[in-house]
Structure formats: structure tokens, C-alpha cells
């Protein structure tokens, strides 16, 4: 993963309305194994996050200036340090306006993955821990806690430059601590949501279920194709890459690689050629689960309508082909 440029600044800010104090670095970070490892770990943590949103830049304006500064950098009108400095000063201002915001180290990294260039911007925090030193003493230790990555964005620079109609070249973590906490960071990026990841994923899964039903596939074949879809989409999610419908179609049916893709287009599901899959929605598709009042039920989604029948009006499930161990337990209880 070649790293073109990388720099870190610090904004000291507590969520109590106090001023945000900027400690800006004057030069880029030199290339090192530590930087490589940091970016690799950051990518892994970011890709694993649930609840990301996808979108595109607002039109450049005084309220959303980042895209203009980024364009100046890419056009070599600003160097990377100058770009990051003016950007972090803007973030400092937005933090001061958001009383709930907390400061931290702001990472800017321009890097390449495969043939694609990205800009990552992340707010990083430390965790306190302990370490054992060379003298075998236990000492306090601070480290960047990438597991607590709550505010970060990734801009696909190649997509932004080459596809003017794209509405999903920016992804960002929406945050779990309330809408207002993360809104200032989204406004800093200047991003408007263009793609509903969970909604697009649900539509894709609905299209797949309709396809399986229309093909009247045997249970084993349906299970294999379901597994193929989930594994491919999950892998793409881990890589931070979108699901490509044509590629997915060729994996689902190697003998008829366009069958599923043509089904989607002919039925007009309104799906884009590439969609950002949502991990949580995929997991729900893999299995149905529920627990209440001492009862726990879990079964693979493809069994619904076959070995498991749901009567919505009566609110009941009929399960066929019970596991032998469960049948034995029930018989012993009856005896």
C-alpha cells in the first residue's frame, strides 16, 4: 500500500464548551514501518466498522470548503502539508461550534491501494494501558486505540476525478453517540449522503431471493448460491470495496454468468452497478434469529418456506425435519 503523503495534527478539546486548541505539525511524516502499520491497521478497523454511510461532495462553498482545497492539492496548487493545515483549522472551528465534540489526533493520509488512490481522514484517540520494559518493570503505556474509531472518512480520489456522476466516492462513519456528535465531522468533509448502504443491500437480497424463487432451485443449490453471495459481499465489505453486480452474477452461476444480472435489470430493482454492502444486513440475511421468554430460535434464511413455514396471521412457525437430538430429548421428557 504505497503511502504518498501522511501527516498528523492535534486538536485539544473537551466536550464542555471549552475552546479547541490546535497543535499543528509543520511537515509530513517520514516514511516508516510504523506509518505503514498504522495505515494498515486503520484500514482494517475502518473496513470492519458497521453503520458507515456513502455519499459525495456538496458543491464547493464557504460552508463546505474541503473539496476546493483538496482539488487545489491534487492540481498541485497546494502541497499536502498546506492542504492538511487549512483543513484542520476548519475542523478546529467546527469543533468549537459543537459543544459535544472531543479533540484528538487528526490523521490525513493520501495512499494508493491497487490502482485506486484514497484520502483518509480520521480522528484518533489514545487508550491508557501498561507495558513491561527492558528492565522487566511494569510501566504506564499510551497507544492509539483504533478499536474506538468513531469519526473517520475515506475519499476515493480516483472515483471522484474520473466519474463525475458518482454518488458514492466518499464513505464515513456515522457514529453511535447521537446525530449531533457526528454531524460536525460530516459537515467538515462536506459530504451529502447519496447511497443508502443498508437499503441497497436489502434490495439486492430481495432481488436474489426473487431470482432463486423464479429459478425453482433445489435446496442444496439455493444454499450454495446464498453462501456465495454472502461470502463475496462480506469479503468486499472487509476490503472496503463495493459489490459489483456483474461480478457477483458470474460467481452465483458460472454456467450462466449474466443470469442474475439480467434478472436485476429486467425487473428494474433500481440498483446501481456497484453498491456498498452493509455488513449488519448481510448477517441478518444469513440467519433468522430470535429469543424471548426462555425460547431461542435460529435457522438459515434459505430454509424459510421449505423446512420452516411462517404463518403471519397466526404468529406461528412450523418446523419440519427436527434435529434428532432434539427429538430424543422430547421423547425422553414425554416418557
From Swiss-Prot:
One Pfam assignment: NA37
Gene Ontology molecular-function annotations: double-stranded DNA binding; single-stranded RNA binding
Domain of life: Bacteria
Subcellular compartments: Cytoplasm, Nucleoid
Family named by the database record: Belongs to the YejK family.
Alphabetized PANTHER family for the sequence: NUCLEOID-ASSOCIATED PROTEIN YEJK, PTHR38772
Alphabetical list of HAMAP family matching this protein: NdpA (MF_00730)
Listed name of the protein: Nucleoid-associated protein PputGB1_0980
Source organism of this protein record: Pseudomonas putida (strain GB-1)
Organism placement in taxonomy: Bacteria, Pseudomonadati, Pseudomonadota, Gammaproteobacteria, Pseudomonadales
